[in-house]
Swiss-Prot record:
Active site (record annotation): 178 (proton acceptor)
GO biological process, one term: lactate metabolic process
Species in which this protein is naturally found: Staphylococcus saprophyticus subsp. saprophyticus (strain ATCC 15305 / DSM 20229 / NCIMB 8711 / NCTC 7292 / S-41)
Substrates-to-products reaction catalysed: (S)-malate + NAD(+) = oxaloacetate + NADH + H(+)
Name of the gene encoding the protein in the UniProt record: mdh
Official protein name in the record: Malate dehydrogenase
Primary role: Catalyzes the reversible oxidation of malate to oxaloacetate.
Key words, A-Z: NAD, Oxidoreductase, Tricarboxylic acid cycle
Length: 312
């Protein structure tokens, strides 16, 4: 069987961490790409990961490069490149800076890997996913944004912490835009089948929801310089694994909506089934009136950022 190939654009903390996780699990060979002025950094990080292979016992190949030709025939390309989020900076502030990065990177991806799936991480990720989709000309199932897996992981971890129970027993989903208007689906959240509202009071639940919405900003403030990368990289790994192994996982992803949930021509976080096709299908849940109203607010917020894109 031909070994799979994953290319990661951007060798910052998230990109390098993702490369390490993918290699460690022998999911695919990895090509880590960065700008020419970062050639030493990207090659050094790739070499460092390779030198850990005897310890972990993996045979995946990890290559650091500044040449997009090395990404040729990738099965999946992950975009992490872009301006980082800084303290006090909203994701929306990044839209003008990162749209051009998405355009330039996408043209290289299409040139060398015309049949790949693209996963976008660059913030503001809902708008950047839309930008990449338009720039690529790919069918909508092959361009996917990452936010929901990460936001859901944060939501679940905060619940497990509050209840002092195993993270393995927490079930829940977070939909909507990747920002302050995201929508944790509290009504369907449960702990091994027990509804969350039977275990926590309304005030406790609201505190967890608010902390989830501010999860990225909390880490940015604590770090002082930079943003989260362990959890984001882990979230992308889960998506990559679902696609490469054709697992048909139901995971929240950013997808282009064409009438689902009442929205069109917008990329938004919704429940999706991920398979070797990319997005196999979008799952439409029966939301409560309050959840649907919150999702509308979130979609409006994403649309506002999308309107700032120069190429819609």
């Amino acid at each position: 069987m031909t070994k799979k190939k994953i290319s990661i654009i951007g060798a910052g903390n998230t990109g390098a961490t993702l490369a390490f996780i993918v290699a460690q699990h022998e999911l695919a060979d990895v090509v880590l790409i960065d700008r020419p002025d970062n050639e030493g950094q990207v090659k050094g990080k790739a070499l460092d990961i390779f030198e850990s292979s005897p310890v972990y016992g993996f045979d995946a190949k990890v290559t650091g490069s500044v040449n997009y030709a090395d990404t040729a025939d990738s099965d999946i390309v992950v975009i992490t490149a872009g301006s980082p989020r800084k303290p006090g900076m909203s994701r929306d502030d990044l839209v003008q800076i990162n749209e051009k990065v998405m355009f330039d990177v996408t043209k290289e991806i299409v040139k060398y890997s015309p049949d790949c799936k693209i996963i976008v991480l660059t913030n503001p990720v809902d708008a950047m996913t839309y930008s990449v989709l338009k720039a690529s000309g790919f069918p909508k199932e092959r361009v996917i944004g990452q936010s929901g897996v990460l936001d859901t992981a944060r939501y679940q971890s905060f619940i497990a912490e509050a209840l002092n129970v195993s993270i393995k027993d927490i079930r829940g989903l977070v939909l909507g835009g990747h920002g302050d208007t995201m929508v944790p689906l509290v009504n369907s959240t449960n702990v091994n089948g027990v509804p969350l509202h039977q275990l926590l009071n309304q005030t406790q639940i609201e505190q967890i929801v608010e902390r989830t919405r501010k999860g990225g900003a909390e880490i940015v403030a604590l770090l002082g310089n930079g943003s989260a990368y362990y959890a984001p990289a882990s979230a992308v790994f889960e998506m990559i694994e679902a696609i490469l192994k054709d697992q048909h996982r139901l995971l929240p992803s950013i997808a282009l909506l064409e009438g689902e949930y009442g929205f069109s021509d917008i990329c938004l976080g919704v429940p999706t089934v991920l398979s070797e096709k990319g997005i196999e299908n979008i799952v439409e849940l029966a939301l409560s009136d309050n959840e649907q109203a919150q999702l509308r607010i979130s979609a409006d917020s994403v649309e506002e950022v999308k309107q700032a894109l120069k190429n819609q």
